[in-house]
A protein has these predicted regions:
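A short, flexible low-complexity segment enriched in Lys/Arg and Gly/Pro that occurs
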Residues: 1, 74-81, 122-132, 230-251
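Short, acidic Gly/Pro/Ser/Thr-rich loop/turn segments
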Residues: 24, 47-48, 149-152, 189-191, ...
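ATP/NTP phosphate-donor binding region
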Residues: 1-95
Length: 251
């Protein structure tokens, strides 16, 4: 059984910094990536949670200024992204820290996508046959910090948003926009309601099953998927019903 209480760094497919308390290194991570004034993007429901204030305090201790943008609904809209871009530009920010569950990270990734270029948001629609011809320097440097289990969306650029004119959900992305790194701090998952732990854990389990079941066989991905299935199926029930045990282990 892996020891999940130790710190570990690896790259797959982007740099990942894992371990209890790694959030306390966020200011250092910003400095290492030449981010001096990040916009912290999260959703309204997370705005007043302790970890948001902690991110700002840790950044300040590393002489990194930051501002929180939290005008994000559970299903982020194109209008909210436009307001987020305006906050990014007016605040003269040089990076984005996307923190939260799906909505916070989707919004942060979308603001990173359009924050320092003039391309229309929907030009990045995943269903378009061609993406805008932009270099990686055309996108805002991005750090992702997930606060729940789930899809692994912190490692890639896709963001699901609501098109308010057509009242449909659309996916935006660009192949050259990827997070600089993801910070996986399991302490952020402690204290979640049991039902949310169950939902997001099942989400992660289903993604692992899907990854193993796809017809395009890949031995590396199959190995990762099978290990994820083994770990989640052996831990999820205990995490939901005895979450305090995990909290004691991480104390």
């Amino acid at each position: 059984m892996p020891n999940f209480l130790t710190h570990a760094d690896w790259t797959f497919p982007i740099p990942i910094r894992y371990g209890p308390g790694r959030l306390l290194e966020i200011g250092e991570f910003c400095s290492q990536n030449n981010i001096a004034n990040p916009l912290i993007v999260t959703d309204r429901g997370s705005r007043d949670l302790p970890f948001i204030e902690r991110v700002g305090d840790v950044c300040l201790a590393s002489k990194v200024q930051s501002v929180v943008f939290s005008d994000i609904s559970p299903n982020p809209t194109d209008q909210e992204i436009a307001r987020g871009k305006r906050a990014f530009v007016e605040g003269q920010h040089d990076g984005v820290i996307a923190i939260g569950g799906g909505s916070g990270m989707d919004a942060g990734k979308a603001i990173s996508l359009v924050g320092c270029n003039d391309t229309d948001l929907w030009a990045f629609d995943y269903d378009h046959s061609e993406s805008p011809d932009l270099a990686s320097e055309s996108f805002v440097p991005l750090i992702c910090v997930p606060t729940t289990a789930g899809t692994g969306a912190e490692t890639e650029s896709t963001a699901m948003l609501t098109d308010t004119e057509q009242s449909v959900k659309r996916c935006v992305w660009h192949a050259k926009q990827k997070p600089l790194l993801a910070v996986l701090d399991p302490e952020l998952t402690l204290g979640l309601p049991a039902d949310l732990t169950a939902w997001t854990g099942c989400d992660a389990l289903v993604h692992a099953i899907e990854a193993f079941s796809v017809p395009d066989w890949n031995p590396l991905c199959d190995g990762l998927a099978l290990e994820a299935i083994r770990l989640i199926s052996g831990s999820l029930d205990r995490a939901v019903t005895h979450g305090e045990i995990f909290q004691l282990l991480l104390a």
